[in-house]
Swiss-Prot record:
The protein's name in its UniProt record: Dimethyladenosine transferase 2, mitochondrial
Enzyme class: transferase
GO molecular function: mitochondrial transcription factor activity; RNA binding; rRNA (adenine-N6,N6-)-dimethyltransferase activity; rRNA (adenine-N6-)-methyltransferase activity
Superkingdom classification of source: Eukaryota
Family: Belongs to the class I-like SAM-binding methyltransferase superfamily. rRNA adenine N(6)-methyltransferase family. KsgA subfamily.
Protein encoded by which gene: TFB2M
Keyword S-adenosyl-L-methionine set for record: yes
């Protein structure tokens, strides 16, 4: 069984999996890692909490973040702010710590403070920071403002970074937040709006971070409460009852998290600002008619108590992507390209008929499929892969 802990790398190569000789080259049938010594795989379960030394934000440099014409959506309607506070108040304890992403003009920030919450405001636009800090001076230390973009935490392949781009280690060390055991949850809740132009990519990054226990999830089972476009929300919550919307993102999200749509609001109630704090009009009719759904993503406590771990999640991702490439095909037709194990035997193990299609499988069925192959007694070769999979895992 995997033991959650900090220090897990954000991406893992094939050589980092828990057993040698689990993969075969698709066309040649040669075990790619057959000759890798077993001792090379030792120690993968022995991670302990090891945070980086304290870092002074001002002394870091980066070429990754360049000021460009970005637009962000903000809560500017008092009614929406009151609704958010009301739906969050249900489970929230008095004095709950809220990490608010890109609060902008601070309408939601004020509502959260008035409800008794303590707020850490991560704002990526310097133009909003003076007013937010002024608000903080009037609430007896219950608001802290940091120049940071939550959705750009821990950029992949980064060197040294400078705010608003940060690493989660920099942020949480500064806040004094320590890593928590996975089953014990997390001491704060995250509230924000997904960036409109990179919404889907941001969702994928969140899922990668969650399954690999990296970024904010290295510190515990963080609950995200995010406004997401209704279009992406419907995909995230889709299942075999809505096959046209059902996809690998749906399975990954529902396998990892409890997903609740807390409320839905029209996009017209959210103002859009350019990166310089200037109000912009929503130009496209589609964006005006699109609703935003306030979605709660709560990672499951038992996500890593079975076969799935942060060391083999990449294979689970690949299995789903491969299956949904031909979503209406029969599962039995996909299995020979995924595993050398007899396809009929696998279907019997997961108690599915030979004519079951990919879009007929619920998230729990895909997880059972993954566990069945991963726990097979055939230790020499469980999964097949080709250059496509190698690219996906790199």
């Amino acid at each position: 069984m995997w033991v959650p802990g900090a220090g897990i790398p954000s991406r893992l190569t094939l050589s980092a999996f828990t057993r040698a000789a689990r993969f075969c080259v698709l066309n040649s049938g040669v075990a790619r890692w057959k000759d890798v010594p077993a001792e090379n795989c030792r120690g993968l379960y022995d991670f302990h909490t090891q945070l980086k030394p304290d870092v002074e934000f001002g002394k870091l440099s980066s070429r990754l973040y360049k000021s460009r014409s970005e637009t962000k959506r903000y809560v500017t309607s008092p009614r929406v702010a009151e609704t958010v506070v009301r739906v969050l108040r249900g489970k929230r304890k008095a004095g709950q710590l809220i990490l608010e992403c890109n609060p902008g003009p601070g309408v939601l920030t004020r509502a959260l403070l008035e409800s008794g919450a303590r707020v850490i405001a991560l704002e990526s636009d310097k133009n909003f920071i003076p007013e937010l800090k002024s608000l903080g001076n009037s609430v007896n230390g219950r608001l802290e403002v940091i120049y940071c973009d939550f959705f750009k935490l821990d950029p992949r392949n980064h060197g040294m970074v400078t705010p608003p781009v940060m690493t989660s280690d920099m942020l949480f060390q500064y806040l004094g937040v320590k890593a928590h055991p996975w089953k014990k949850g997390f001491p704060l809740k995250v509230v924000g709006i997904l960036p409109a132009k990179t919404e889907r990519n941001t969702l994928w990054k969140i899922l990668h971070d969650l399954y690999s226990c990296s970024s904010v999830y290295k510190y515990g089972r963080a609950e995200l409460n995010l406004f997401i476009s209704e279009k992406e929300c419907r995909k995230l919550t889709a299942n075999p009852q809505t096959p046209a919307l059902y996809q690998s993102l749906s399975v990954l999200g529902q396998t990892a998290c409890g997903i609740k749509v807390l409320c839905t609001e029209p996009s017209s109630l959210f103002d859009t600002y350019a990166i310089k704090g200037e109000l912009e009009k929503q130009r496209h009719r589609e964006s005006l008619e699109q609703n935003l759904c306030f979605v709660q993503l709560t990672p499951h406590r038992n996500l890593f108590t079975g076969t799935l771990t942060p060391f083999n999640y990449d294979v689970f991702f690949h299995m789903l992507r491969q299956c949904f490439m031909k979503r209406n095909a029969k599962l039995i037709d996909h299995l020979p390209s995924l595993s050398p194990i007899d396809a009929v035997h696998i279907l019997k193990q997961i108690k599915k008929k030979k004519d079951v299609r990919v879009v007929d499988m619920y998230p729990k069925d895909f997880l059972r499929l993954f566990e069945t192959i991963e726990c097979s007694k055939d230790d020499t070769c469980k999964w097949l892969y080709d250059e496509f999979m190698e690219d996906a895992l790199s």
